[in-house]
Amino acid sequence: MENLPAVTTEEPTPMGRGPVGPSGGGSTRDQVRTVVMRPSVSWEKAGPEEAKAPVRGDEAPPARVAGPAAGTPPCQMGVYPTDLTLQLLAVRRKSRLRDPGLQQTLRGQLRLLENDSREMARVLGELSARLLSIHSDQDRIVVTFKTFEEIWKFSTYHALGFTHHCLANLLMDQAFWLLLPSEEEETAIQVHVDENALRLTHESLLIQEGPFFVLCPDHHVRVMTGPRDAGNGPQALRQASGAPQGEAAPETDSSPPSPSVSSEEVAVAAAPEPLIPFHQWALRIPQDPIDDAMGGPVMPGNPLMAVGLASALADFQGSGPEEMTFRGGDLIEILGAQVPSLPWCVGRHAASGRVGFVRSSLISMQGPVSELESAIFLNEEEKSFFSEGCFSEEDARQLLRRMSGTDVCSVYSLDSVEEAETEQPQEKEIPPPCLSLEPQETLQKVKNVLEQCKTCPGCPQEPASWGLCAASSDVSLQDPEEPSFCLEAEDDWEDPEALSSLLLFLNAPGYKASFRGLYDVALPWLSSVFRSFSDEEELTGRLAQARGAAKKAGLLMALARLCFLLGRLCSRRLKLSQARVYFEEALGALEGSFGDLFLVVAVYANLASIYRKQKNREKCAQVVPKAMALLLGTPDHICSTEAEGELLQLALRRAVGGQSLQAEARACFLLARHHVHLKQPEEALPFLERLLLLHRDSGAPEAAWLSDCYLLLADIYSRKCLPHLVLSCVKVASLRTRGSLAGSLRSVNLVLQNAPQPHSLPAQTSHYLRQALASLTPGTGQALRGPLYTSLAQLYSHHGCHGPAITFMTQAVEASAIAGVRAIVDHLVALAWLHVLHGQSPVALDILQSVRDAVVASEDQEGVIANMVAVALKRTGRTRQAAESYYRALRVARDLGQQRNQAVGLANFGALCLHAGASRLAQHYLLEAVRLFSRLPLGECGRDFTHVLLQLGHLCTRQGPAQQGKGYYEWALLVAVEMGHVESQLRAVQRLCHFYSAVMPSEAQCVIYHELQLSLACKVADKVLEGQLLETISQLYLSLGTERAYKSALDYTKRSLGIFIDLQKKEKEAHAWLQAGKIYYILRQSELVDLYIQVAQNVALYTGDPNLGLELFEAAGDIFFDGAWEREKAVSFYRDRALPLAVTTGNRKAELRLCNKLVALLATLEEPQEGLEFAHMALALSITLGDRLNERVAYHRLAALQHRLGHGELAEHFYLKALSLCNSPLEFDEETLYYVKVYLVLGDIIFYDLKDPFDAAGYYQLALAAAVDLGNKKAQLKIYTRLATIYHNFLLDREKSLFFYQKARTFATELNVRRVNLPPLPLCGWAPWLAPSHPR
């Protein structure tokens, strides 16, 4: 302990978790002293080169500065370092090299959590760290701590290896845990922490919280209280003066030190080092001042415990019957163990056989304990504590039934439309006559098993034992024999003869198993012997009478046990003085006898507890050290008082002061056992954690008890609702030691209880199931092989890995060959169904046919087989045979009265009819299935019921009535919500979203259900779906057209943007940036529009995909092109960015589209001359692509531009070219209307621009013909008026003018136009050249 332990050897535990008992051991004058000095001295020992934290060459510097320079002591810093960087690495276990593929996956998950860090903060909270930031690009997490307790817990968890697995459980998906064993062992997630930074953080938090304990170079533990200016050397520290956190602290030497001693201590204390967090906590626990005088000083010496023989170093005369008298050189056999730092031990004189307490300082041990495990456990029975009553054989049976049980063997399987649609095309055809080699091998194995099946008994008996721990969940491994008598209240308790059975029983000279209940803290012995006593007061009086009878008869052992019992009863009622008298009498009755060592331990422990509570310093000095020696040195002693924990805490303080890791480990084990026995498991946590770390740091070989200890720790974490710590603890247990069968199954159970939802079968269990298989023995293990393989098959199938599931189920079939006919058939049916799910329906048909041919299935199994055969036949395209098989299955279900199977059979019939195109018949069968399902409990058939309702709703929306289909969708959603199945809820909501967006559009309902779907996507942690939904909801709000809706759309767009960034979906990200820019354009926030568009363009260019760039540039131009302001900005996006990309990539269609947009935009912006270039380009591209419609559009736009530029003849030419490309004959009214408009424009061009009334009249008449054909009266009125004017004023044809005028008047009357004028002057104003010359 000369150097501060590194991060891997710090074993902190939560300050508030352990029992609050007295601190320290006997007089702590030499154990804990006070050093008054500058705190910075603690770090002076480290030079600059030691203070710098090592940085790997391939790592970037931390994203956040965790603190000042490493070589600066915290007390000299302006800010205490409380931040820590966690570096996450994906490595290969054997070579320790990085795994680039897994590292990328890890970085992707970190990126997701960087956007939404709530789950990461939750996991780090379990590790007692506070999340500051995530830097996914550097694979780093920055955490901080605010208290010493937090850094203590975190460093403990990290040292135990929990941080690696906690973060792996969070960051890795379920597929990672389903890797094959070779792959699983190959890769791992590791969390690296800078040890120097962790040390500085720990020390700075210690300084912030007040005085703390340090180890000085003279190997003494002292308290660091403050700067050197506070005093001139070690000072006495009494009571709470300067104790850590204001608690009572150990007292130092009461006599003032001499100057020479003072200066020497100051000199040796030049470079003290803080104790590790666990020792800080153990010494901080408030102690009683009377403990100062107990047991003498603790001097650092031999830290090893000792067993076996010892030789006396000097003569010793015992001061009482319980103390051994011996002479120097005598041999003494130690009973149990001699614990360093304790002044007493129990021994037997080799020559005389006398047993008593021996002064540890007066003997020399011949057998020091070299192995830590031998110091922790003094016999084999103590090791059983970790697995005692935790996981019984019945628990294991129930677990395997839950894991391996499947409805496929007893309940008809529903033919899912989704599964059928995913069947491979070749498997829908008639199967080929010859199967591949692998299916042939499977079929051969099936036939072999069926042959063996015929010779097996129908209902074999399960083995009486699976070889698991024999302890049940509530029965101890040591089942004491109950006494064979029972005393009633009416008996004469003063007559020794009447009490002979009780007194003779209690007067046994040694320990018997039935005495365990007498010494136990709960006193179960009383309830078994004195059943008729309901009043404890009356019982105490009767026992007092029995005590008198024992005393009168001279039965000393009975007297001692009765006095002990009376003392316990008085102590329970807080009659401490009376209890002390009884315990003292019990001690006196023993007369130094150690025949019943457990009784001696119980008496001393209870008496020491009473003396401490009564503050009896003198008696404590005599009894407490001996009680501690008995508690630590006696193997498998019985916990007899709750105050035993205080004595063990005192022994732990002395072990820390004496720097004996073996004594510390023994004390931690006993404290953990004590608290677990008292149903205080959370108080045992710090001691279990410290025990595991002590064993790890000792370099001792792995042992079986370690696995059980980790699992006990995991069970306590589970009680504290720390699921990630549970999973990590279980994983570490499996990696550190080769677990037993019971331990592996116990691990599976813990994972099932603590795995995050919504995984009902978490993939993490696969590792422990395979471990259980590896631990099976050839004898009893054979019965478990089948259920374990079946459990693995169900697990892999649940997660969609049907290939490995088939392999495991095949092995389960082979392993269950002796399990009985029904079990074999069930396994074969399950195997066939897995082949169906895997898209191998022909193989499934062959397996099921083999079962049928063997004639071994029961009637209900025949129904299941018939239904499954029908499903497989349907998927291979044999509809008729499938219908026949469904009918057989339905008939079996009706004969057996199985309503659920009838409902599934009818639903399958409906799906088959729908597949065959008989939708009305399908609807009939589905309705019948719904009627049956509605009568069944949802717990049995909820998922199938939901699926059938969705199927029926889909059918109704297709063929009507659609409103009824909506009702079935809503019913399905209610059923899924009631049974709490998220996947079913998601499917139902998706159907409702489609219904309200496509079948019966409703914007409000569509938004509501999309938002519900979004919440469900968050529950199942599907980020891809979540991003898509956010994008869709944004579009929905955008379509509402209100400012509030636009702001909501912007919010959803930004959320989707964050997800797309995390998922590295660059295309989606670019579109999201652009969508946000579009919404800002609608909200008229112009300064943000350009910014978001620019970022979108940068993202598109980052991908290096010119097609994406082209799409983005065009879409950016569309924002302005479709808007009402700043439309000129669209020109640069179209002309300068998108069009060159379209030319470069050879995308002629995009080039044509852009040219058309530019022509239209430039025409609107009054720049027809510039538009001509793009109009000609559009025309050329249209001709090249053979697109007649776009060619006609191009000619039309060219004509319009030429018209605007005043080029009448060119405009006439292009209009005529456009008309020549129209369909002939005309098909639609729109085409006729186009003729009307174009001929009108041509007439105007000829009349006004080319000054040719005659040709203009011709175009007008063509327009009139089209208008008459169309029946457009307004157009006819307009054209008739024009013709009347031309013929009246310019062509001077009065007859035609009158005709056209009358026609115009007729349409004017019909259209309620009051007057039709033929004024020549306005026309002359429009076209001066048309004005007639005056007569001369």
From Swiss-Prot:
Residues 62-74, 247-266 have a biased composition (Low complexity). TPR repeats lie at residues 560-593, 601-634, 665-698, 786-819, 863-896, 946-979, 1027-1063, 1192-1225, 1277-1311. Coiled coil: none annotated. The modification Phosphotyrosine is found at Y1248. Residues 46-61 have a biased composition (Basic and acidic residues). Keywords: Acetylation, Phosphoprotein, Repeat, SH3 domain, TPR repeat. Residues 1-76, 225-266 are annotated as: Disordered. CDD domains: SH3_SH3TC. Residues 18-27 have a biased composition (Gly residues). The modification N-acetylmethionine is found at M1. Residues 305-368 form the SH3 domain. This is SH3 domain and tetratricopeptide repeat-containing protein 1. It comes from Homo sapiens (Human). The gene is SH3TC1.
